[in-house]
Design a protein with these regions (language model features):
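N-terminal glycine-rich phosphate/adenylate-binding segment common to multiple enzyme folds
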Residues: 42-142
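Short coil/turn connectors at secondary-structure junctions
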Residues: 27-30, 59-61, 99-100, 112-115, ...
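N-terminal beta-loop-helix "entrance" segment that forms/cooperates
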Residues: 23-52
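Glycine-rich beta-alpha junction loops
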Residues: 36-38, 71, 122-123, 175-180
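Conserved beta-strand termini and adjacent loop/short-helix elements that scaffold enzyme active sites
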Residues: 33-37, 106-109, 174
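Short, conserved catalytic or adaptor-binding loops enriched in Gly and charged residues
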Residues: 24, 57, 94, 194-198
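Glycine-rich phosphate/diphosphate-binding loop of Rossmann-like nucleotide-binding domains
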Residues: 1-15, 20-21, 137-201
Length: 201
């Protein structure tokens, strides 16, 4: 993030952290470190979506609280009309570099009897080569989706393990295997295999 933080999210996150961890911070047990260097302008200047010094600093920390990163969309332009570069998503690079393969999203709405937890594969699929597509001509573009058995089994295992530890007996795999026969089809096979062989309960 930039310092002082320009994002309301990071401003409030730091405020809450300083309140919650006040004793630990005062004793020196916990140190809050601000990692700078992720402004879009700097990344464009360096030609790096995730600068090496920023990644190295992230790897030195035990816990990361990340603010929003800006990744230009295809066709975005600078204020002067110059096209923005086709950059890999900094979020995707950070996930891959730190092996953050699972996006875990719990949702609880007791009055509607909703107690769900979503596990989304965070590294493979469309995320792995998001800027490596092929523009065949003005009328045709091709992008890639990559799914490995190992990646599919790992996210499935994480979801099943969470379910077991939290007393849940239903795990649902959501795919487009009816359309994306190979990548999503293989993902679905991997989920069923892990469920049947390792988590029959």
């Amino acid at each position: 993030t930039a310092w002082p933080p320009t994002s309301l999210i990071m401003t409030q996150a730091l405020r809450v952290l300083n309140q919650l961890l006040a004793p630990e911070i005062a004793s020196g047990k916990v140190k809050i470190r601000i990692i700078e260097g992720m402004t879009f302008e700097r990344r464009v200047e360096l030609g790096e979506s995730l600068p090496a010094d920023v990644l190295a600093a992230c790897k030195e920390c035990n816990v990361l609280i990340k603010g929003p990163f800006t990744t230009p969309r295809a066709g975005d332009k600078f204020p002067d009309g110059t096209p923005m570069p086709n950059m890999v998503s900094a979020n995707s690079l950070l996930r891959r570099s730190l092996d953050l393969f699972a996006a875990v999203r719990p949702i609880k709405i007791p009055e509607k009897n909703i107690d769900w937890c979503f596990f989304r594969e965070n590294i493979e699929g469309e995320y792995i080569w998001g800027n490596k597509g092929i523009q065949v001509n003005d009328d045709l573009a091709i992008d890639f989706k990559v799914q490995t058995r190992q990646g599919s089994e790992r996210i499935a295992r994480a979801a099943f393990e969470y379910a077991r530890k939290n007393g849940k007996h239903n795990v649902t795999a959501i795919t487009k295997a009816n359309i994306v026969k190979l990548a999503d089809g293989n993902f679905l096979k991997a989920v069923h295999h892990i469920g049947e062989t390792e988590y029959p309960d």
